[in-house]
Amino acid sequence: MVSTFSRKNQNYKKDDLNQPSKDGRFGKYGGQYVPETLMPALFELETAASNAWKDKLFVKELNHLLKTYVGRETPLYEAKRLTEYYKTKKAIPKIWLKREDLNHTGAHKINNALGQALLAIRMGKKRIIAETGAGQHGVATATVCARFGLKCIIYMGAEDIKRQSLNVFRMKLLGAEVKVVNSGTATLKDATSEAIRDWVSNVESTHYILGSVAGPHPFPKIVRDFHAVIGEETKKQCLESFGSLPDILLACVGGGSNAMGLFHPFVKETSVRLIGVEAAGGGVDTDKHAATITKGSVGILHGSMSLLLQDDNGQVQEAHSISAGLDYPGVGPEHSHLKDIGRAEYGSVTDQEALDSLRLVSELEGIIPALETSHAFAWLDKLCPTLEKDTHIVINCSGRGDKDVNTVASSLDI
């Protein structure tokens, strides 16, 4: 069940919404828990990013490439048949989709990969590494490396390679070297760990294009800021389409980059509800889920303090989701902070609920969403019956489902 929204749960001050702090903290979360070897690289990256955003030529080049190469701005689409499906006697949920699935490479990931590639060039780094789970960040990184002539190495868990063979081929076709990670659970967590080990060993020549709003400062801020174009466009498009800000923003959350990209320009617009949806896998009361915010506790993973799935001894537990992109036992520190202060709400849906929603959206709107995105759509089943009035809901359609066809075909009786 979804709890009825109440502003009594909000306990933040103005400064709580102006994050991170100078030392890279979102409240008590974030920070830099890394080997000394990486501290100069993190400082260099923070300085490069700060200077880049002040450089009109950098911003002009980024915006030009977002338009001509990525295909921005992406449409805000009115999902009329979904609206009809979810309307009740009390309320009509007017559902809008922010179509990040229409970006070049098929997801939101290209926004950040492009921006960080430009930063790497500014820093003189010609070797790029990245981690990937669903393969979309890997494809986006391989794409921008091909565009700029940069050497590209992608770390990917063996389990995810089985689930995402199409994206593995795409990365190789784009000229990237895909390194298989067999350690641990052979999923996104382990791929990230291997990428960090590579970076420690090759820090002088290499830039790590981290794919989510996780990791040590300044990565959560850098990734968020490159994805904020999603929310900035959404704000403008909502005013153009229906003359007001949306009532609710809805996005799936693994590490949390697509959600933060949508949420960030609205964080100080406190009339707008922000809802993130995690992967409940086989159920949050089982040991097979990735609902970090729902069930996690404070710990340190991949250089950052945040909420984690861990046992009583602080050992990181295995996450599970049918969606490779949500199959991660941590979450970005800003999400943990927004949850703590009550500015954002978080729930979870199971594998089966996500599959059912993928099929529903496909049949009603002619749009096949990614399994990750389908978790956000599935939350409509829980949210819409609670609405007391007509409500504008914007869902971040973070990626398309082409990559998931084999997984879905084996799970749905079609």
Swiss-Prot record:
According to its UniProt record, the EC number is: 4.2.1.20
Reactions listed under catalytic activity: (1S,2R)-1-C-(indol-3-yl)glycerol 3-phosphate + L-serine = D-glyceraldehyde 3-phosphate + L-tryptophan + H2O
Protein name according to UniProt:
Tryptophan synthase beta chain
Q: What gene codes for this chain?
A: trpB
A single Gene Ontology CC term: cytoplasm
- Enzyme class, spelled out: lyase
What is this organism's lineage? Bacteria, Bacillati, Cyanobacteriota, Cyanophyceae, Synechococcales
Q: Does the keyword Amino-acid biosynthesis apply?
A: yes
For this protein, the record's NCBIfam families field holds: trpB (TIGR00263)
CDD domains referenced in this protein's UniProt entry, alphabetically: Trp-synth_B
Q: Name what cofactor the protein needs.
A: pyridoxal 5'-phosphate
Q: How does it assemble?
A: Tetramer of two alpha and two beta chains.
The annotated pathway is:
Amino-acid biosynthesis; L-tryptophan biosynthesis; L-tryptophan from chorismate: step 5/5
